[in-house]
Amino acid sequence: HCGLVGSEMCIRDRNIELFQYENENYYAVYGWSSRDRENVPNPNTVWNLAKGKTLTPNTPVTLQWTSPKGVIFEREISIDEDFLFTIKQRVFNQSNATIDLAAYGILARHSAPETIGFYILHEGIVGYDDGELVELSYDDITDQKYDDRERANLEIYEITENGWIGFTDKYWMSTLVGEPQSKFKMASKYNEANDIYQADIRHPLQSIGSGQSTEIKTYLFAGAKEVNTIKTYQKEADFADFID
């Protein structure tokens, strides 16, 4: 694994580097959004290693950061042998006021990759929206309706039970998976100004009172599209219709 930088994650799968953060080509980002931007971590935040040393299937790691107002953010990251990450984002509000936060996860890809163009092979965004398969080519993503607020071509999916979204290539897939039987939003997005394609998971806004805490769990699969592995996640982890 090539490591963590701020809120960004880069992954090497055996001898294949699937995500790259050095030149900002392809990466995963986790965080919290809030109107009080100084009270949440950002891409330049320096996290402390609170627990663990090296991320392995047997040893998770926990990162921690405390905001100027005394809100503690933790991110626990674990991984299995087939490159399924479990991400637990925790907030402990030790400030004197209620805070409103919404957790998110983003897969970002700068510029469309070169695709094979074979008609029976889908390359682009793939997802699952409460029983409906989502498949978008890179051209489809750029053709989405423009959203003035986000300044991007955007499609939002309201999830009530099961959903996942990500990018699929010929042999590899990177996918954000929401916790089964939970409500959240997914988004496919294209920012023309920066030529960035995104697949997002957006969790509902939460109000966390002083002295209270919360935890959001999501999954990130970033590995080979091995049928037996994918079927195992579909059956044992309840990732609905994970075979794309």
Where does each model-flagged region fall?
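Positively charged, low-complexity/disordered segments
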Residues: 2-6
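Soluble non-transmembrane domains of integral membrane proteins
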Residues: 7-8, 12-243
